[in-house]
Amino acid sequence: MPSSTSLVRELRNISEKRGLVIASTADIHSPKHLEELRKAVKKVRERPDLVLLAGDLINKGKVDWYAPTIETISKLEAERIIAIFGNEEYDETHDMLKEEFGDIVTFLDDESIKLEIKGVSLGVVGTKGSLEQPTTWQERNIPGIREVYEKRVKKVEKLLMELDSDIKILLMHYSPTFKTLFGEYRNIWPQLGHRGYEKVIEIARPDLVIHAHAHNGSKRAVLWNIEILNVSFPLWREIVVVKLSKRADLEQYF
């Protein structure tokens, strides 16, 4: 039986022998939730093949807290750690974080990667995502931010369509749908995500979509039989663990 301290969701058809174990979290805002993260890591009973981090590991660009956060996550002993940047990893910190932690963490910034794990090819597209309504600060300080967000939607679709792998995962910070925002005030939903990605998901058909940012939102939603997981740590208070099988198995299930 799965531990009650972790979510083990069997998506469609799971092969216990060949399934990939993926652990995911985000919104640690270190040091705010760092101690609680340490406790959560100790409760994960299954060694993951891959860790996916959906941004905001640190609070307000405090890069000094990235090291203890990654050190904690590394105790999961996964084969690979992939991360994206959230809005709290300020743009000016990206190069610094890549340089300092690039040997431990693979950072994806509107990029994709293809891995071979347990004989299964797994592709990940990683992006900060977009907002339908940029924040007041963004409007004032980032020239052309609305255009940046709209172009990113199209770029992510292109990256997913070009990804040739048994399993495809879309890893984002901002929400790709409003369906996982229930629990947040409705008037701020446009500043938490962008529904343009719903069409991307429908067209490109990733096997799993992971996002964060909505601390008080919903844990999951389903779009076109595709699981959308909001892995925000303040929402779960634990590491989210998912098992995925090969696409061939998924097709046989339906």
Name these PLM-found stretches.
Residues 15, 95-187, 232-233, 247:
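Conserved catalytic scaffold of divalent metal-dependent phosphoesterases
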Residues 26, 54-56, 86, 172, ...:
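Active-site flanking residues adjacent to catalytic metal/cofactor-binding acidic residues
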Residues 1-32, 76, 249-254:
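Acidic, histidine-bearing metal-coordination/catalytic regions of metal-dependent phosphoesterases
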Residues 28, 171-176, 207-217:
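Histidine-centered catalytic micro-motifs
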Residues 16-19, 113-118, 147, 196-204, ...:
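Binuclear metal-dependent phosphoesterase catalytic core
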Residues 30-118, 184, 191-196, 200-203, ...:
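Core catalytic region of metal-dependent phosphoesterases/phosphodiesterases
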Residues 76-77, 158-167, 200-207:
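A structural motif corresponding to the C-terminal end of an alpha-helix
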Residues 21-22, 50, 122-123, 167-169, ...:
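Structural motif
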